Structure formats: structure tokens, C-alpha cells
Amino acid sequence: MANIVFKLSDKDITTLMSRITFDTENLPQGMKARAKYQNTTVNIYQSGKVMFQGNHAEAVSKELLPQHSQLNTNKTKKKNMANSSLEQTLMYDQFNCIGSDEAGSGDYFGPLTVCAAFVTKEHVPILKTLGVDDSKKLTDTKIVELAEQLVAFIPHSLLTLHNDKYNIQQAKGWTQVKMKAVLHNEAIKNVLEKIDSSQLDYIVIDQFAKREVYSHYALSDIPLPKKTKFETKGESKSLAIAVASIISRYAFITYMDQISKYINMTIPKGAGAKVDVIAAKIIKKYGLSRLDTISKKHFKNREKAQKILKPL
């Protein structure tokens, strides 16, 4: 399905609205008018942007906005690509979407957690009221607070790849990208079993690999490939991804707290110098084998921690 976007003046919008019949009532927040014309949806936003959506979007846009189509024939594609992040923010939250994201992939300690969540357009106002946002902008305390509310009413699937299984798969030659592709795909399929898929508009995955790479690792088993989109920095473009990010991060934080209690010391997130020091302390107190049960063995932190202990 093609999406073509124009930025119009008030005068041009008035002209467009005189050419076909638009609905102006009971519209999502931020939308000024909507029309169906020749199997194409035409959305006019309060921002002055107009989106043509459908298999005939290009032909319809040329018919209804001939002056813009002629002027922009050679440059609109590049311009729309440059503006795609902004437009996707508008688009996804106007539709019913499954979003998926993961946590723990860049952390030496702790598991890899993946969540897929189904967010309808009716959920959007309450999610905004709750303060749902990119999890990277939220404190751990806020993530826990939000997640405990979200899991109560958002259909979702949360999968956890614990360190023992993670290390086994990595030793078999699985890259982290392959692990994530398999987990994302499985979580999405789990959510599809919980909902009426006829109500689903898009599946939006926080992009960690190109579509063809994801498809390869998922054994070409993407459930609804035509509805599946990949978005970089997806948390800021889709509330469905933001919700999935919060829930997956919540699960990761919970496991990290459990690890800290298990080891009887505060375990830092990430993979920096502080992590090396704590890993060295764990080796000294409990041994390397214990460290491997709560960490990702292939990270450089393991080697660095051992080097810290050598002079001792």
C-alpha cells in the first residue's frame, strides 16, 4: 500500500476539499478531514499535511493535486523519504497496530526480553494520558509504574531468553540478530492468536535488521508480510512500539533486580567499565561459572573482568 504526502497551504486545502466530499466529524485527534475516493483514503491533517493512502494513491494525488504532482514529480519521493519519520508518527497512531521491541540486547548482564503489543486507535488517548513515551526517556521507576498498568488491558506477548539458553544458542552460531528475529516473530504470532486479525492495520517492528535479513532468520515466516513495517527509532513513531518497549524493559528491569539479590550486589546495566568491575568481583567471589549464568558470555566484558583480576 502506497503512502504519498504533501504539505499544502490553507488555500490549496480549501481547493482540494471542493473537489471531492470529505468527512469532518468524528475524526481522530490531529485530523481535519477524511475522504474515500477511487479506493484511496485521503487524510487532511491540522498541520497542513495531506496523505493519500492506497494502491492508487499516486494516480489519485495527480488527479486531485495536479499542480503539486507536476512540480514534484522528480523530487517528492526523496522529500517523502526524508519526512517519513514524521509522517509515520501521524499514520501509525491513527490505526490498529501490533508493535514489537526488545530490551537487554546491549547489556552484558541479564536476559534478552522481547514484547509484542496490540494497540488500537481507541487506546491512543488513554496511553497519552498515562504518559506512554519512548522507554529510553523514562526512568526505571516510571517504566515499572506504566508497565503494571499496561499489561492489564493491552493484549501482548512477552518472551524472555534467559542467559543459559542465550549462551547455548550463541555457541551454536546464532547471532543476536537471529535471536531477536525469532523472538519478535514468535511474540507477534502469539498476539495475533489473541486478537481479531481482521481489525489489524499494521505490524510495526522496531528495526534492528533489514527486512530481508529479518525474513531470513524468521525462516520467511512473517505472519502478515504486506502489513509488516520496519521502523528505526520506532518508539518515537508508534505508540504500539512504545508500549512493547516499556513492557520488555519492565521485564528486563525485574530480572536485573532479581540478579542483584541473587548475587547480593547491585548489578549495573549496559556494557561499560562499571560492568567490568562488578563482573570481576563476581568472578572473585563466586567463580567464572556463576558469572556465566547471569551474563552474555560473548561480550568483551567477560574477558576484561578476567584481566582486572590477573594482577590481584
Curated annotation (Swiss-Prot):
It catalyses: Endonucleolytic cleavage to 5'-phosphomonoester. One of its GO terms (biological process) is mismatch repair. Keywords: Cytoplasm, Endonuclease, Hydrolase, Magnesium, Metal-binding, Nuclease. One of its GO terms (molecular function) is RNA-DNA hybrid ribonuclease activity. Residues 95-311 form the RNase H type-2 domain. It is an enzyme of class 3 (hydrolase). Its EC number is 3.1.26.4. Its cofactor is Mn(2+); Mg(2+). Coiled coil: none annotated. It is found in: Cytoplasm. SUPFAM superfamilies: Ribonuclease H-like (SSF53098). One of its GO terms (cellular component) is ribonuclease H2 complex. Pfam families: DUF3378, RNase_HII. A divalent metal cation binds at D101, E102, D206. The keyword Metal-binding applies. PROSITE patterns: RNASE_H_2 (PS51975). NCBIfam families: rnhC. Belongs to the RNase HII family. RnhC subfamily. Endonuclease that specifically degrades the RNA of RNA-DNA hybrids. This is Ribonuclease HIII. The lineage of its organism: Bacteria, Bacillati, Bacillota, Bacilli, Bacillales.
